[in-house]
UniProtKB/Swiss-Prot annotation:
Sites carrying sugar chains: N370, N443, N665, N720
Record's protein name: Dolichyl-phosphate-mannose--protein mannosyltransferase 1
Species per Swiss-Prot/TrEMBL record: Schizosaccharomyces pombe (strain 972 / ATCC 24843)
Any Pfam family: MIR
Biased composition (Low complexity): 807-823, 854-864
Region (Disordered): 785-893
Amino acid sequence: MDKQSTFQDPKEKHRIQRDVKLSRPRKRFSFLDYVVVIFLTVVAFCVRAQRLMNPAKVVFEELRYYNYAVDYVNNKLLMDVYPPLGKLLFSLVAALTGNKYELNTLDEPGQQYPFTDVAYSMRLFTCLLGSLLVPLMYGTVYFPTKSKTAASLAALFVIFDNGLITMSRYIMIEIPALYFMSLTAFYWSVYEAQQKRPFSLRWHTSLLSTGVALGLALSTKLSAMFTFGWLLILAAFHLWNLLGDLSVPMYRIVKHLFSYIFYLIGVPITVYLAVFAVHSHIAYKASVADAFLPPEHRHALAGNRFDDQFADVAYGSLVTIRNAIPEHGYLHSSELLYPEGTEQQIISLVDEPNQNALWIIEHEHSQDNNRSNIELLKDGSVVRLRHVMTGRALHSHEHKPIVSNNDWQLEASAYGGFGFEGDANDLFRIQILEKKSKHATSNGTVETLNTKFRLIHVFANCELMSSHRRFPDWGDYQREVTCCRNCVERSTTWFIESNYHDGLPSDSRKITYRKPGFLESFVEHNKLMWLKDRKMGDGHVYESSALTWPLLLGPLRFFYEQHLQVFFMGNPFVWYSVISLVAFFVIVQIFCLARWNLGYNDFGPSAFHYNYNIGKFVVAWLLHWAPYILETDRVFLYHYLPALYFGIAALGVSWSFLGNAVFGNRTAYKALSVIIMALMFLVYRLYSPFTYMTTLTKSSCRALELKGSWNFHCNTYLDNLSDYKFSSDAGETYFEKAAPHPFVYSEDTAKKSEGDTPLNKNLNDYYPSWDQRVEAGYKLAAQQKAEQEAREAAEKAASEAAERSSSEAAASSSSESVAAASVEAERLAMEADEFNGASETVDGASVEAERSAMEAAALNNAAESTEVVGSSPESVASEQEENVAESAQARVE
């Protein structure tokens, strides 16, 4: 009786029917399914394609991908941090709709598209891929739920999300990448529907299709690695369940394991390699992007000719020296001087070799600089690098560099000139790096192209280094070179690219760059992608933290013109529904886990089925969102779209579960579904002016700023809709530029110094002029030395003449003193005669006469002594006074 009543219970009967329905494998869509899918896809396309060329100008990162497509059409190499498939697809559209010889790259965002039919076709292609997300979402939800209502609801969420619509309207790589990720999820859902029939043809084809789709996703954008990780987790979960099923023999588990390895690892890698093979076949011509490639890869491109070079490097060789980091370029100098500090000649790096990148290797002792005596460079050789065009030597000293200005770095400069041998601060020691010199000979000598070495300053013990900084305008924005202590080896590694020595026999061994194979080029390209992805520029005004994405805290403005704007803005109803579901699912899992620990089992077959399928999409949401939390540079709101897609899939499966487990009345369930669809459509319409760049009033715009972090720049719009009809003001054009790209040169870096003329292929052409300048320099130095010696001799003669003139002046002064003393003596003698004749004053006169006579005698003696020995004026005067006194005394007597 109880058993019969149980089967008559409507809820229990519905549960049993549901479990049977979910366990039955679904072979194909029904006719009604196809009708629904086609209808929804057409609606999605119409929603995305309206006003597609509004604006008909370059928007945000369209510039990058449009130019990439043009480069592919012209068979030029391009470098990007993303794999090539998405750009190849854009180039295919451009090639089919445009003239190869008329397509040119564009300069900046906001620029008018020269050929609107090409741009329209490329945007239409993105629009088509965005529309195809709808049938993929429908199938992804339908296969695990068998619910048309839930699948349709999820598809409508994709159709009317403003963010997905916006990204589907522009030439950007996000939608192609998302399309292949969603294709991977779709085929995995098809595969899981075949679990009851393992190793059948449909089982193999669905798993193979999953691997192919995953390979295409990885070939479009590396963020598909998150999808790859998600599939590995699901495959491991399936294997774990098989291990727990004792009815499954071990050989079948091993077959499952090898099937997963082949289809989910081997097939994607094969597809990835195939895409790069197509890329290498199409992009075979040289371009500005090849500066980032290692030299052997760069010179393998058409248009980059490189002549054979002498293998042996000797003193007297004329060389160009290149840093091991490809984009850092060639050691260079010119007439530019540091504006402060030592004010010596600047040492820098340039992207392309030119005459100012030529150096001649001199011996540390000038008397050994004889090119006819060939002495090869080896490990430990001490050299002086002389700049060919200016004659100055590479130099370093205890001065901090102006730009880097670090204590562990010293300034590198060029010092001296032709005819100046230089000083000890010009000397550098060569240290060969054996591990990096893979293809060099093992005889310990320096070999062109193959030997990697350091240049170590002999006295400062610092290493010549390529800096990551650039000079400002006074240094023509060239890359700085310093001499550093304890720095990164890669920045201090150099090699000689061009080498010529007129003393070497013409039949001497010569070498050139070897041509790398496909796998080597593949590895190098991917290594550059991974490395450069870590150096994506200086950020952007609209980059945001991934923690804010699920709550849609900040819209991203793409474009503004004539009081109209384009924003990347998601549908708040869709985005908040997704994050609410994720939060609710986590809470339910915690609650069920707590009950399970208490001995309760809340998971029957149906509940477990839904819990697994909701959980797998929540895990996908987490894997496609959480890694961006660790990123701090160049992360934008639209990077959340893959996570949003999987969140919508989880939402669709959850809605099916609610319909089966909660709503006993199917009519109420479907009515509520219609209400949700209507609310979603209403919110889409409210924010559509930001999607399609249509008119909006200031007041309506402000009403849409529901959160404090939303800023729609509402003052951009006019006060009334009628004002747009009469407004002749075109307004200011505004566009957001993408952040600087690591594989794109800025305009500043393209500047060249004066004298940076192209380098002749035959370096021997520079030897005659070099020898002439050296000879002229030494002649000038000898002439300057002779002139200096003549100046020194003249100065010495002038000094001696000045001394003689001073002595003669002193003697003349002494003669005048003697004459004055004689006059005084005669006067005293006359006075003495007068005293002699006066009898009444004889005694007093005698005393005075004696004194006067003594003074006169002293003066006379001094005068005689001065004439004989040339005494000083003071002594002469004293002796003269004594002589005069003696004479006067004699006369008195």
